[in-house]
Amino acid sequence: VSIDQYLREQFPTGAFTPLNKTEDLDVLVAGCGTGQIAIASAQKYLGARVLALDLSLASLCYAKRGAPDDVAARIEYAQADILKLAPLERKFDVIDSSGVLHHMADPFEGWRILLSLLRPGGLMHIGLYSEAGRRDVWEARKFIAEHGLGSTPDEIRRCRQKLLETPLASLTRFTDFFTTSECRDLLFHVQEARLSIPLIKAFIINHKLRFIGFEFGRPSLQQYRNHFAASGWAWPDLDRWHSFEVENPSTFSGMYQFWIQKP
């Protein structure tokens, strides 16, 4: 489908200006990891030409090997640091950066650099960790520090066992908890910023961006749509979303996943 059709399906009441592009859609995936988002972008959006960047050469090699034949020719891979992309002369219609910016000392610095690469009227999908949604993760990190637990495979197994004996057994809602490498990233990552809807809103206002809406899986999406409609709330109302998250802190336990548009 076109990027416009995809967004209309996700956000029937969301306001955005259509790109009206079904070919030569330049997409940047900033922090492609294993390549899933780059592949999905190439498969999902009509006419997508994807540049997939990552700091890790190992991740890039893995991503390139995993690209299906039907989209491999439309995905270009390159090693790069987001914080050093400002001089890049290429501009993009769509930028996707999910699960990356919150691992920077200043996530908003990285976000600003990505905005500079987005064409006027361009669309951006961002994924950021929620402080409220990951409160038990922060508590687990305190627990780990207090007990002097390390991040070797044996220590991670011991750590998980100890956590299961406490109220922090709630961490089992994260599938990452059960895999050693992913659990290391979940509980032992050395750099992780804490973000909130008011902080995101302030950035959006300061940069005159249009907030289109939060993205959810289908069951949750319909549930939230019904709740907002019954309450008479507008879907892009960030103040309402903040109030909703305060009352329902697990709403964004994965990440804030949302779309914005540059003026």
Segments predicted by a language model, with ranges:
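Conserved alpha-helix/loop element of class I SAM-dependent methyltransferases that forms part
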Residues: 1-25, 40
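Conserved SAM/SAH-binding beta-strand->alpha-helix loop
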Residues: 56
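Conserved SAM-binding strand-loop segment of SAM-dependent methyltransferases
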Residues: 71-83
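Rossmann-like AdoMet/SAM-dependent catalytic core
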Residues: 165-263
